[in-house]
Design a protein with these regions (language model features):
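Charge-rich, low-complexity intrinsically disordered segments
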Residues: 115-141
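Short catalytic/ligand-binding loop motif for oxyanion handling, primarily in non-cytosolic enzymes
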Residues: 14-15, 87-88, 122-123
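Acidic/His-rich structured neighborhood in mature extracellular/periplasmic domains
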Residues: 1-11, 16-19, 27
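Hydrophobic residues embedded in beta-strands of well-ordered beta-sheets
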Residues: 2-4, 75-77, 112-113
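Short aromatic loop motif centered on NTY/YTY
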Residues: 10-11, 31-107, 116, 128-131
Length: 141
């Protein structure tokens, strides 16, 4: 049975949500359905899962922007790691935003896995003071 992966976006008034979702295609008589057991992930930032999730959600403040995209060089989905602006605002998604670190979601052994704190920034001893941060992301995207 074929399973596809969808990167989706749902805007909201106080927080936006980006999804990584599995789509299973049924036979001709069945319709496709969203959500699939293709994730071998027990946590994503502050979200903890009792069971393997059918989809992964990235929720963050609607005035900010967060990256969730496929990168050919790293062979996976690279996403901004999201964290609350203050420790007391854990799980209040309107207070979440990128914290300048990255996570990588990659395909291994028939499931999507996650590697938190994935090192994208290369060869830096001191952080640059301008916007020219050298990362290993594909510059064409």
């Amino acid at each position: 049975q074929k399973v596809y992966t969808l990167l989706a976006f749902r805007p909201g008034p106080s927080y936006h949500t980006k999804y990584v979702d599995g789509i299973e295609l049924g036979s001709r008589s069945e319709r496709c359905h969203f959500g699939s057991r293709i994730f071998n992930i027990r946590s994503n930032g502050d979200e903890r899962y009792a069971r393997r999730p059918y989809r992964i959600q990235f929720r963050y403040n609607s005035t900010l922007s967060a990256a969730v995209r496929w990168d050919n060089k790293h062979k996976g989905i690279i996403c901004d790691h999201l964290a609350p602006s203050k420790l007391e605002l854990v799980e209040r998604w309107f207070a979440y935003g990128p914290d300048f670190s990255y996570d990588k979601i990659y395909w291994s052994k028939g499931k999507w896995q996650i590697e938190e704190s994935y090192p994208l920034i290369q060869n830096l001893d001191i952080a640059p003071t301008n916007s020219r941060v050298p990362t290993s992301l594909d510059p064409k995207r």
